[in-house]
A protein has these predicted regions:
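Core segments of cupin and vicinal oxygen chelate
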Residues: 1-27
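Short beta-strand
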Residues: 10-13, 32-33, 73
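Vicinal oxygen chelate
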Residues: 44-147
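Short, charged/polar, Gly/Pro-enriched secondary-structure boundary elements
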Residues: 26-30, 90
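His-enriched metal-coordination microenvironments in redox/metal-binding proteins
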Residues: 27, 36, 74
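Short amphipathic alpha-helical segments
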Residues: 38-42
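A short, sequence-level motif marking secondary-structure junctions
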Residues: 34-36, 99
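Active-site beta-strand termini and strand-to-loop segments that position acidic
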Residues: 20-24, 34, 85-87
């Protein structure tokens, strides 16, 4: 990502991965070590914390089973978040108010330890956030592009 695509490191999660950016946003992608390659979640930026809450509550009104994790605030990027399952069952994040890095030379990446790599406040993440329930199926190739 850094050499081939020109991403810059914003912060590291000790022993697990790195927050990378290709814009002024604190991070555009988080790359983590895992037994197989997979997409953990997509994220959708909204205007402010009120929109994070309204969007999540609207979805949860008819589908409370889609709640994953939130409302909270990440330490890395300082953005507000709420994670939900989209209609296909994939993790999606509503977020707002992410830090920006307007000048690369003024930014020094930090190494975040433990839960600091995940969040500053809010409820703790559920086990399925840290180890997706379908990870075993991914590892044996049970998921495929053809369904």
């Amino acid at each position: 990502f850094t050499e081939g695509l020109g991403f810059r490191v914003s912060d590291y999660i000790a022993g697990h991965g790195a927050f990378l950016r290709c814009s002024v946003e604190h991070h555009n992608v988080l790359v983590m070590s895992a037994p197989v390659n997979f997409l953990h979640h997509t994220s959708w930026q909204v205007d402010d914390i009120d929109e994070v809450g309204r969007g999540a509550m609207t979805m949860l009104e008819d589908h409370p089973e889609r709640h994953i994790w939130g409302l909270g605030r990440h330490y890395a990027g300082a953005n507000f978040f709420w994670y939900l399952k989209d209609p296909a069952g994939n993790f999606s994040e509503y977020y707002s108010d992410m830090d920006t890095v307007p000048e690369d030379e003024l930014w020094a990446p930090q190494v975040l330890e433990g839960l600091k790599g995940l969040y500053a406040w809010g409820p703790p993440p559920p086990p399925s956030f840290l180890e997706p329930e379908d990870l075993a199926a991914l590892m044996v190739g049970a998921h495929s592009a053809t369904g």
